[in-house]
Amino acid sequence: MVGFKATDVPPTATVKFLGAGTAACIADLITFPLDTAKVRLQIQGESQGLARTAASAQYRGVLGTILTMVRTEGPRSLYNGLVAGLQRQMSFASVRIGLYDSVKQFYTKGSEHAGIGSRLLAGSTTGALAVAVAQPTDVVKVRFQAQARAGGGRRYQSTVEAYKTIAREEGIRGLWKGTSPNVARNAIVNCTELVTYDLIKDTLLKANLMTDDLPCHFTSAFGAGFCTTVIASPVDVVKTRYMNSALGQYHSAGHCALTMLRKEGPRAFYKGFMPSFLRLGSWNVVMFVTYEQLKRALMAAYESREAPF
């Protein structure tokens, strides 16, 4: 057995809720530069036509984007929006991941044998609910990641200022900008990510290919990350563009998608795919492995505290 030993008592809903948020924050700390590179690549060419985009591209590839940012803006630019990112994960992942098992059991009326339909429904529910709770933090995170320090003033100087400025200039609705594409994205992401992780893990365990420890969690998380990136990338690009757009630039998320298709072609929907995969794959591995270990560690601590002397 690698890592903490599984406890006899299943983790409580509170342990899952806190463990998911904490694990997601740890994963964000490690993979945030890849997420920032993804955002920069996704918004690149937004104001240009298809013909000019390739010729005038400032960022080329994951490594090229990171090196360009370090050279022109300094290493700290890779962590622009980290505070909002951690706020997002603590509120977002706690709901979409931490409540997944509870919602799944609700749909199956307490049965441990959940079908694919119940898993998909649970993933969609917690994904959409998480967006409703954490959308303002996502808007601020994307705005910070998108702004460049070089060649002009920054839109926001601090996280608190960003919340205040957006609310003042765009209204409270500005903090929930892009909710529709984000709900769609996270319903897709949550379904694909959690259900794929669930299914891969269950398959490996039932076939006795692996035991319920770190290698199994690593393999399941990596597979879930790849499947999620392939399916969710188009919606993710639209979400990023729309949330970062100036007031009135796009009438709706649908208008944003049509503008992208017309000006940049269908390949625009997979802009930033490699950093998305590197980020989501590595994020999934760190998050799920940490989450599984945190659940076991917290329950072991709880059991030792409750055990009689």
UniProtKB/Swiss-Prot annotation:
Solcar repeats lie at residues 11-106, 114-203, 212-297. It is a multi-pass membrane protein. One of its GO terms (cellular component) is mitochondrial inner membrane. GO terms for molecular function: antiporter activity; chloride transmembrane transporter activity; GDP binding; L-aspartate transmembrane transporter activity; malate transmembrane transporter activity; oxaloacetate transmembrane transporter activity; oxidative phosphorylation uncoupler activity; phosphate ion uniporter activity. Expressed in a variety of organs, with predominant expression in the heart, lung and spleen. Disulfide bonds: none annotated. This is Dicarboxylate carrier UCP2. It comes from Rattus norvegicus (Rat). The gene is Ucp2.
